[in-house]
Amino acid sequence: VEAEKYLNKESIFASNTSTIPITSLAKNSHKPNNFIGIHFFSPVHRMKLIEIIKAKKTSSMTLLKTIKYAKKIKKTPIVVNDSPGFYTTRVFERYTNEGLTMIYEGQKAKSIEKSAIRAGYPVGPLAVIDEININLIANIRKHKYLENEKNNNKTKIFSSDKVIDIMIKKVNRTGRSGLGGFYEYPNQGKKFLWTNIEKYFPISKKQLSKIEMMDRFYFSQAIETIRCYEEGVIESVSDANIGSILGWGFPSSKGGTLKFVNDYGIPKFMARTQKLADKYGNRFAPPRLLQKLSESGKIF
């Protein structure tokens, strides 16, 4: 509101937030039709994607100008509708949360990271978490809790949340920018996994195969993408695929999250999700849209 008085009538007010709903940011604006989200990805000079977020009152002209701006600075834009976490953050979190959940289950950190690399991800989930910073992840989670309270929704505590709490409160390891996180960062030489991980997260006798771990990464993100598509958060299949590859490094060999589902085969994919859901919980439960596609023989 303070800044708006210095802008002309056609100026666009854009936020680079990766999680806070744009509509809630625009509610105090005198020109909510000129308010939009432009989510850049880090490191900005390397990452080609821009996620453009339409708020409830964002005008079509504001959207068009923002798309043109993205192309002018040689970025690839995708357009999504406003929702907590939007599309990319929401689906990307499935990758990191699955890694944290495996740690809580007693899977070896080295196996988790190796399985992710073998699956085609550029960086393992634990290394990504260290780069983001565990304190930042905790702050994002706190914001979600506040949003849930505001909307009278019950907040669930997941295994991944418990791992974050232990890393911050018990061992004070918050990532690369702190004293180290899941990895150690020597002044000279390469980073290596923290040797005390197993002290705080004991190893289970039952270790998963690399294929099982890989599937958990692929399927958790593909299922969340389907939910986003089902809810109208993202309306374009191509944007979903492009966003997943350019935004957070979903394996390009799979063609994107929804292309992965199509190529796997809808009925076969649905059967696998059900098995994963029976084993690991409702986060793998097949969305209704997937069931409808399976019954109709259609694809994304």
Q: At which residue positions do the language-model features occur?
A:
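N-terminal glycine-rich phosphate-binding loop for ADP-containing cofactors
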Residues: 1-300
